[in-house]
């Protein structure tokens, strides 16, 4: 599972996702990629499930790059506990994403095979996505 090795603070404020992605919004490594169309938070399990879906479809050929990393802790209080008495314990990690963010890139396989793999991966994600192809292909 993806999670930071060390963090300065165990808990973080929730915050709000506003605006479009400035960084990580263009294809850097591969030929075809998944790009987000809305705000959302991807858990480490969702990121891994989409990666596995891509790898199983393209089999041995090609390379896959994961362009997001879950570095924001998520907290939760136990079931049947009254409100108050402080913030809950950390239970997992998420990667906050804005519209326009590239999530996965693929290179080294046929474009149609890569497109189908990315479509399968997009079904594992909680945000609307689109498939983008690098200029000149």
Curated annotation (Swiss-Prot):
Record key words, sorted: Ribonucleoprotein, Ribosomal protein, RNA-binding, rRNA-binding, tRNA-binding
Cellular component, GO annotation: cytosolic large ribosomal subunit
Ranges where the record places region Disordered: 1-22
Basic residues bias spans: 1-21
UniProt cross-references to InterPro entries, sorted A to Z: Ribosomal_uL16, Ribosomal_uL16_bact-type, Ribosomal_uL16_CS, Ribosomal_uL16_dom, Ribosomal_uL16_sf
One GO biological process term: translation
Source organism superkingdom: Bacteria
Gene Ontology MF terms in the entry: rRNA binding; structural constituent of ribosome; tRNA binding
Transmembrane feature ranges: none
SUPFAM superfamilies: Ribosomal protein L16p/L10e
Assembly mode: Part of the 50S ribosomal subunit.
Purpose: Binds 23S rRNA and is also seen to make contacts with the A and possibly P site tRNAs.
Classification via HAMAP family: Ribosomal_uL16
PANTHER family linked to this entry: 50S/60S RIBOSOMAL PROTEIN L16, LARGE RIBOSOMAL SUBUNIT PROTEIN UL16M
Family of the protein in this entry: Belongs to the universal ribosomal protein uL16 family.
Protein name: Large ribosomal subunit protein uL16
GN (gene name): rplP
């Amino acid at each position: 599972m993806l999670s930071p090795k060390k963090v300065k603070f165990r808990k973080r404020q929730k915050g709000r996702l506003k605006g479009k992605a400035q960084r990580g919004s263009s294809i850097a490594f591969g030929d075809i990629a998944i790009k987000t169309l809305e705000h959302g938070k991807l858990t480490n399990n969702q990121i891994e499930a989409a990666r596995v879906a891509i790898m199983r479809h393209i089999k041995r050929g090609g390379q896959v790059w994961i362009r997001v990393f879950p570095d924001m802790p998520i907290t939760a209080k136990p079931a049947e506990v009254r409100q108050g008495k402080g913030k809950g314990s950390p239970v997992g990690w998420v990667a906050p994403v804005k519209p326009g963010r590239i999530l996965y890139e693929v290179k080294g396989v046929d474009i149609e095979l890569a497109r189908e793999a990315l479509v399968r991966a997009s079904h594992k994600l909680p945000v609307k996505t689109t498939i983008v192809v690098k200029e000149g292909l």
